[in-house]
From Swiss-Prot:
Its EC number is 2.3.1.274. Signal peptide: none annotated. Belongs to the PlsX family. Homodimer. Probably interacts with PlsY. It holds the Pfam family FA_synthesis. The gene is plsX. Keywords: Cytoplasm, Lipid biosynthesis, Lipid metabolism, Phospholipid biosynthesis, Phospholipid metabolism, Transferase. Catalyzes the reversible formation of acyl-phosphate (acyl-PO(4)) from acyl-[acyl-carrier-protein] (acyl-ACP). This enzyme utilizes acyl-ACP as fatty acyl donor, but not acyl-CoA. SUPFAM superfamilies: Isocitrate/Isopropylmalate dehydrogenase-like. It is found in: Cytoplasm. One of its GO terms (cellular component) is cytoplasm. GO terms for molecular function: phosphate:acyl-[acyl carrier protein] acyltransferase activity. This is Phosphate acyltransferase. GO terms for biological process: fatty acid biosynthetic process; phospholipid biosynthetic process.
Length: 342
């Protein structure tokens, strides 16, 4: 493993350096080959570095700026008027080859716009997509994309998302021939809108993609497929609904286990299993959505992420950088396009 540099928007998210800096310190303790460039207000960042070990601080660089992209900023406004923002400067470090990946918990639309303009998309890719990993009943990861970067998509864009999702599953999880499905209102070929039906027809013609057909919402967590593709409108609602249900289940389980002497006693006996279950159900365990299809690695964290959740997003960014995800997607897409045109 070689040394790796991560550019981190220290000011992004609901809590800024209060979360991003402690998570950075934890990540550096876990990975001795990692260096992190914290981009943001140096005075605020330094407040959270006072007690850090000297050996850890030696692997931190601070790039000072006081400008921040507000959560209320529209993407075009941020692109034109936030040229010295912590988010933009972090992305520029990736563009300039000074970092191998970028992470931000800030404004999603601004992150998408800046990343696309500064890093450009890969050959054959029209739009980047936000993708995240979801749990499944058989403990295998399921990738869902797009999560909101593209509210509406034509069939060609959905096809490109399917290719990128397949390569992501192969690269990050070493899944052999990942099963890819299109999220739809039914599994029959006549179901769904024109875009989804046409995307299905395109995927059926590509033997390199293990396309299994349509999948309905109740099968997302079944583990029957490895990659699920949809437009950003559907994907974002699906993800947020899932996170809400997961938090409800965790709350109800904790409440139930606290009622009655014998229930509390039983809960203590099986505490390790309960902790494992709660961890699997906790959305923070899966924090970090990748903006794939770019000539560089950009990861988006939840704005409300706590330290543990933000650390998870850092780990994701490092993993993708180590496995050279953009290059893997580009190589695979080039191979598929050559076969189509031959």
């Amino acid at each position: 493993m070689t040394n790796l540099t991560l550019a981190l928007d220290a000011m992004g998210g609901d809590f800024g350096p209060r979360i991003t800096v402690p998570a950075t310190l934890q990540a550096l303790r876990l990975n001795p080959l990692l260096k992190i460039v914290l981009v943001g207000d140096k005075s605020q960042i330094d407040e959270h570095l006072v007690s850090a070990e000297p050996a850890i601080k030696n692997r931190i660089e601070i790039k000072h700026t006081t400008e921040v992209v507000a959560m209320s900023d529209r993407p075009v406004h941020a692109l034109r008027n936030r040229k010295q923002s912590s988010m933009r400067l972090a992305i520029e470090l990736v563009r300039d080859g000074k970092a191998q990946a970028c992470l931000s918990a800030g404004n999603t639309g601004a992150l998408m716009a800046m990343s696309k303009v500064l890093l450009k998309t890969l050959p054959g890719i029209d739009r980047p997509a936000l993708v995240t990993c979801l749990p499944a009943v058989n403990n295998t990861p399921v990738y869902l994309l797009d999560l909101g970067a593209n509210i509406s998509c034509d069939s060609e864009t959905l096809f490109q998302f399917a290719v990128m999702g397949s390569v992501l599953s192969e690269t990050v999880d070493k899944t052999a021939s990942p099963k890819v499905a299109l999220l739809n209102v039914g599994i029959e070929e006549i179901k769904g809108n024109d875009q989804v039906q046409q995307a299905g027809q395109l995927l059926q013609q590509i033997p390199q993609i293990n396309y299994t057909g349509f999948i309905e919402g109740d099968e997302i967590y079944s583990g029957n497929v490895d990659v699920i593709v949809c437009d950003g409108f559907v994907g974002n609602i699906t993800l947020k609904t899932s996170e809400g249900i997961a938090r409800l289940l965790v709350h109800q389980l904790k409440k139930a286990l606290g009622q009655g002497f014998f229930v509390r006693l039983l809960a203590k006996i099986i505490a390790p299993r309960i902790r494992s279950l709660l961890n699997q159900m906790n959305p923070d365990h899966y924090n970090g959505a990748s903006l794939i299809g770019l000539r560089g690695i950009v990861v988006k964290s939840h704005g409300c992420a706590d330290e543990a959740a933000f650390l998870q997003a850092i780990t994701l960014a490092v993993t993708e950088a180590q496995r050279r995800l953009p290059q893997m997607i580009e190589d695979r897409l080039e191979s598929i396009l050559l076969d189509i045109n031959s």
